[in-house]
Curated annotation (Swiss-Prot):
UniProt-recorded name of the protein: DNA polymerase 120R
One record GO biological process: base-excision repair, gap-filling
Signal peptide start-end: none
Catalysed reaction, written as an equation: DNA(n) + a 2'-deoxyribonucleoside 5'-triphosphate = DNA(n+1) + diphosphate
Gene3D superfamilies: DNA polymerase family B, C-terminal domain, Helix hairpin bin, Palm domain of DNA polymerase, Ribonuclease H-like superfamily/Ribonuclease H
């Protein structure tokens, strides 16, 4: 008897959803497939069919929709015009604006509702494209006339609508009833338990009972694949390129294990060409005879093991794009890309571009395979941690104390060449060394994935933001906020209108207020902070889209009124006023020193002035909402309040679990640790989401822009922090040392107080001031007294913390100073730290005075510098590198009408025709060099590295040192070199100690000025050593022997009609004559200057690179002709350059 192909499941089936796929291939119906794990960690695929997606069509208010025949007419028109669209007349609130009306019965104000048609369809294409496009044209409806409609809600994809309507977690436990598909031939997926839920089938009851949120809390254990590639480069000194024949993917390491798995559960595989040995590699070896078979073997292994998560390090920028490009080059992409749970369906290549404050600029590729969740660990680490560099070796050493073998790219390429040469033990050894290194990369990534709780962090953030986990990588912040807001609006019957507010040109919000500090070294400073300032302001003053009262008929007593003036860069701006005052004094004073000081001060003001001038009066009103009367509570305040409450509950639960953990052992302890880790990631997700909620309102071109909210929140933030500062000074006789955004640093009259008394006083002050603000605004004492507080300028300070019992912590906190900046060398940080330590650790009355101690420390460090007592690593500088567009400029005209150019993300001067003529720039190479000179020095170094054929480090941070040249006037771009290059040539190159000392002048002299009122101490030290260096260079120049080396030219020329090359050489005149003899059909492809050590460069070149040569690189020679022999022209040019430089 044949087995049934399906089985009806009447009881709820539970599964943990982690991946969502919207299938829009069908024109008539959109399908949603959800992939997850059941309670036994088996793979599950749930196909949700019959879900009617929806949009809202706004109806004009000038028609009386209380008349049923008007409603019937418009509904009938839509049903007849679009038969596949379901239409319902609804009255909803609008998101934008406080739309109120007075009740006729009691005169109270109530929310006004507006007429909409809710249009639903099985086809998302119909609702997203067909219907909105048609409705752009006014529709003539019998009895109603010509009506122009507006469509809202099409920004919400079917997945967002489904999860919002039925309150489903995007990463969490879901329960459903439906049909289980048993027949493998009928199944859509492979290696999954497969179910179908048809929401349109009335026999199952209401759709909300067919699929809904589950109350299970079991922690799933997805199968994780961590992988890494090793790729050859046939050029040896250049980065691999997928379209080059010899740039072969020759090894792929794969680590499989369940989340939370132990070491002995790990499955290790190395897919490799050649013949590596398992003993050295420490993994099961899967050997392949060709690269194509290896690539397909990777696909087969993925499909066999069926991992839920595929992770690696920098895989979005290298590994996955390279595999995709390589399989395209090998003409196997479609077959290779069939790596998802869906049978015989290739993954879709996705190219992503977006940016945010956390992730910065993101540009990457990945393969969108159903059911596979791709997670790149590099952007996760970059977002959450500040490190000097983000190389895997650095990150793994920092977090898990493990490292990997040192194997640079050149050695990897050699392992490939030697390892694939033959089947000898030597070849096997080379391939094994590389395989071991490759396996180490994958294992470190897996351990980091576990250590950093990446799964918990992403899943909890996905749930809070109502987006799938992959969206956290592929989309920016706006979609996260929009998804939360959409879900709330759907439940509250509020329409999130598209283009509901048009941002005016003069609407820009001013940032937080920063008080001008009183620089100095203070004792026992109290830090007082607003807790979650912007979310609290949003709640306290009910600042929201739906509460902004533009309607003048709404009385002021119902509203919070916010009125202020914005003066930025205009005549009323205090900075501009001060600049004008300084200008007048400069024109009248005759004292040169005073004039110089004022010019410097004026220059600083000019730099700080905003280019965007604002001179505006603002007034906004927002409906009040109280605990007793919450009728008018806004959407954003409600969402934020819910998140803050949920965070509070989560943290309380963490506290209870930590208490239990103190006495737990064995499996119970492990379970509690896991629960605490999950809850910690959850409370962080609530915190991050609550703090970023208001940001979407201030993005002019965003999904839901509303500048009045952003402007009013920042205004109230400035107002409240200023009010606290006033209260601290007037009511509590405190001295305001500094204030910034949400914090005040105040010094009370503490000489007669013990530390515990001062502590208690700070708590009382914070509580009393909090009572003067509406809840939930709360001023908090940070539970730390800064026993010493060194304030330098705005946003730059250092402090040492004391506890209630007077215990002083050794660590020195810092903000905005040299110690916080990763682009400063270790030497600068050391000398700065030594100075700071000497100030903070000095005890008055013990030994010498503070000034003598500090100056001795600084002087000793400077002497040690020029005595070579610091290691080389202390002079390494790291800076992040950006895309510079391969030196291909995109010209534009800026707001001032000045021609500029963009080189990738760098804004540089434009090469105008006038400059081109003046500087005689004729060739493309000269143009590129001109633009290169306009880029930052470390970006110029990046291009220098590329031209050398070396590979820049992963993670976008470049390490370099500054070396001496023969001139003190040379630009930094001339002196800058990579650390490996310097190390290799340190017998010739010397570090430029003067440069490093010069970098210390401002930060060190700033502290000395603030603490001791001492001017230019380090600067004078620098000037003395600079003078000495200048004399040394002049003496060296005076006694330097002069060598006259005559150089000849060598030119590579090519026939225009044929790919035939020749060499012409000799003096410049000789080359011109030879080229003239060849005729007009020959053109110059490359020029070199060389010392003529050989009589006939052509014969030397032919003997070395001809058919009988021993080298791998060969060209065809016939007479004086040279042919490429299937190699690129660039190969011939680089070979000539190397031989005759």
């Amino acid at each position: 008897m044949d087995k049934p192909s399906t089985k009806i499941v009447n009881d709820y089936t539970h599964f943990y959803a982690y991946s969502w796929h919207v299938d829009e291939e069908s024109v008539d119906e959109t399908f949603i497939r959800v992939y997850g794990l059941d309670e036994a960690n088996e793979n599950v695929c749930v196909s949700v069919n019959g879900f009617r997606q929806f949009v809202w069509v706004e109806l004009p208010s000038f028609i009386d929709w209380s008349l049923s025949h008007n409603v019937d007419r418009v509904v009938r028109y839509f049903e007849q015009t679009w038969p596949n669209v379901g239409v319902q007349f609804k009255m909803y609130r609008k998101l934008y604006g406080a739309n109120l009306k007075q009740s006729r019965s009691n005169g109270e104000y109530v929310h006004k509702k507006f007429p909409f048609l809710q249009c639903s369809s099985m086809s998302w294409k119909m609702l997203k494209f067909t219907l909105p496009t048609a409705l752009k044209t006014p529709q003539r409806i019998m009895g109603l006339g010509s009506i122009k409609f507006r469509v809202h809600g099409q920004d919400a994809c079917p997945r967002l609508q489904l999860t919002s309507k039925y309150n489903l977690p995007t990463a969490g436990w879901i329960q459903f009833k439906g049909i289980e598909i048993l027949d493998q031939d009928v199944k859509f997926s492979q290696s999954c338990r497969e179910f179908m839920v048809d929401l349109s089938d009335k026999n199952w009851g209401k759709p909300s009972t067919m699929i809904c949120r589950s109350d299970k809390t079991t922690v799933p254990r997805p199968l994780i694949l961590s992988f890494d590639l090793e790729v050859n480069s046939e050029e040896v000194v250049t980065m691999p390129k997928a379209t080059k024949p010899g740039d072969v993917v020759f090894q792929i390491s794969c680590i499989f294990n369940r989340l939370g798995g132990v070491e002995n559960e790990v499955e290790r595989y190395l897919l490799s060409l050649g013949n590596p040995t398992e003993q050295i590699v420490g993994a099961t070896i899967l050997r392949y005879s060709t690269e194509k078979k290896l690539l397909m073997g990777f696909r087969d292994l993925v499909n066999e093991k069926n991992p839920n998560v595929i992770t690696g390090y920098n895989i979005f920028n290298f590994d996955i794009p390279y595999l995709m490009d390589r399989t395209v080059y090998k003409s196997i992409f479609v077959e290779w890309a069939q790596q998802g749970f869906a049978k015989n369906r290739p993954g879709i290549p996705r190219e992503i571009r977006w940016s945010s404050s956390a992730y910065k600029n993101q540009e990457f590729k990945y393969l969108d395979c159903e059911g596979r969740l791709y997670i790149d660990l590099l952007p996760v680490v970059q977002r959450d941690f500040k490190l000097n560099d983000y190389k895997l070796k650095t990150v793994s050493t920092f977090f898990i104390g493990e490292t990997k073998d040192d194997l640079d790219p050149t050695s990897i390429f050699r392992c490939y060449r030697e390892g694939t040469r033959d089947d000898s033990p030597k070849a096997s050894h080379f391939m094994s060394i590389c395989g071991k290194y490759c396996m180490q990369d994958s294992m470190l990534v897996y351990k980091l994935f576990e250590k950093l709780n990446v799964w918990y962090g992403l899943s909890e953030m996905a749930v809070v933001c109502n987006v799938p986990m992959i969206t956290l990588f592929t989309k920016g912040q706006q979609i996260k906020v929009y998804s939360q807001l959409y879900k709330y609006c759907l439940a509250a019957k509020i329409i999130p209108e598209k283009d509901g507010y048009i941002v005016a040109e003069n609407e820009r919000y001013v940032g937080a207020h920063v008080f001008t500090p009183k620089p100095g070294l203070y004792e026992n400073v109290i830090p007082l902070d607003f807790s979650s300032l912007y979310p609290s302001l949003m709640i306290a003053y009910n600042i929201d889209y739906s509460t902004c009262a533009f309607d003048a008929s709404i009385p002021d007593q119902l509203c919070h009124i916010m009125e202020w003036e914005d003066h930025i860069g205009c005549a009323h701006d205090p900075k501009v006023v001060e600049k004008e005052r300084l200008t007048q004094l400069i024109n009248t004073l005759k004292n040169k020193e005073e004039v110089s000081r004022m010019r410097k001060e004026r220059s600083e003001i000019t730099k700080s002035l905003s280019k965007n001038v604002m001179c505006e009066k603002r007034k906004y009103r927002f409906l009040k909402s109280t605990t007793e009367d919450g009728r008018f509570k806004g959407v954003l305040p409600t969402i934020v309040q819910n998140m803050l409450d949920a965070r509070k509950e989560t943290r309380a639960e963490m506290g209870r679990l930590k208490k239990r953990l103190g006495t737990a052992v064995g499996e119970e302890a492990t379970h509690l640790q896991t629960q605490i880790a999950i809850l910690n990631q959850r409370q962080l997700a609530y915190k991050v989401s609550a703090n970023s909620m208001y940001g979407i309102t201030g993005v002019k071109a965003g999904m839901l822009p509303f500048m009045p909210v952003a402007m009013s929140i920042t205004f109230m933030g400035r107002t409240n922090i200023a009010r606290v500062a006033q209260l601290l000074q007037t009511q509590y006789q405190g001295e305001l040392v500094y204030g910034d955004t949400d914090s005040n640093y105040v010094s009370f009259n503490h000489k007669n107080m013990s530390m515990s008394e001062l502590w208690d006083y700070a708590i009382r002050v914070a509580d009393e001031i909090s009572q003067q603000f509406p809840p939930p605004i709360k001023l908090e004492f940070e539970e730390a007294i800064y026993s010493k507080f060194l304030i330098l300028t705005k946003k730059r300070y250092l402090y040492q913390t004391a506890l209630r019992d007077g215990t002083i912590k050794k660590e020195i906190g810092k903000r905005g100073v040299v110690l916080n900046r990763r682009d400063n060398s270790g030497f600068i940080r050391k000398i700065y730290q030594n100075m700071v330590d000497s100030i903070f650790n000095h005890v008055a009355g013990e030994g010498r005075d503070l000034k003598s101690v500090v100056l001795d420390v600084v002087t000793a460090d400077i002497c040690a510098l020029f005595n070579h007592q610091f290691p080389v690593d202390d002079f390494v500088i790291t800076k992040s590198t950006g895309n510079y567009g391969d030196l291909q400029p995109e010209n534009f005209v800026n707001e001032k009408g000045v021609p500029r150019a963009m080189l990738g993300q760098y804004n540089v001067p434009c090469l105008t025709s006038q400059v081109r003529e003046e500087e005689r720039i004729e060739t493309e190479e000269q143009e590129q060099n001109w633009y290169l000179d306009k880029l930052p020095a470390h970006i110029q170094l990046l291009e220098k590295i590329r031209r050398r054929g070396q590979m820049k480090n992963e993670g976008g941070r470049l390490e370099y040192v500054i070396v001496e040249t023969n001139s003190l006037k040379d630009k930094q771009s001339t002196k800058i070199e990579t650390l490996p290059y310097y190390t290799k040539n340190r017998g010739i190159l010397k570090l430029d100690y003067l440069y490093y000392l010069h970098r210390c002048i401002n930060p060190l002299d700033q502290i000395l000025k603030v603490v001791f009122d001492l001017d230019d101490f380090v600067k004078r030290q620098y000037k003395a050593r600079e003078a000495k260096k200048k004399v040394t260079l002049e003496l060296g120049e005076l006694f330097r022997p002069n060598f006259i080396i005559e150089k000849s030219q060598l030119q590579l020329v090519r026939a225009r009609a044929d790919e035939v090359y020749r060499l012409v050489y000799g003096t410049a005149a000789d080359c011109r004559a030879q080229l003239g003899e060849l005729g007009p059909d020959w053109c110059v492809r490359a020029k070199f200057e060389y010392v003529p050590l050989v009589d006939d460069p052509y014969r030397y070149f032919q003997q070395k690179y001809g058919a009988t040569g021993s080298l791998k690189t060969k060209f065809d020679f016939e007479g004086r002709d040279i042919r490429l022999n299937n190699q690129p022209e660039s190969k011939l040019v680089s070979t000539l350059k190397r031989e005759f430089k």
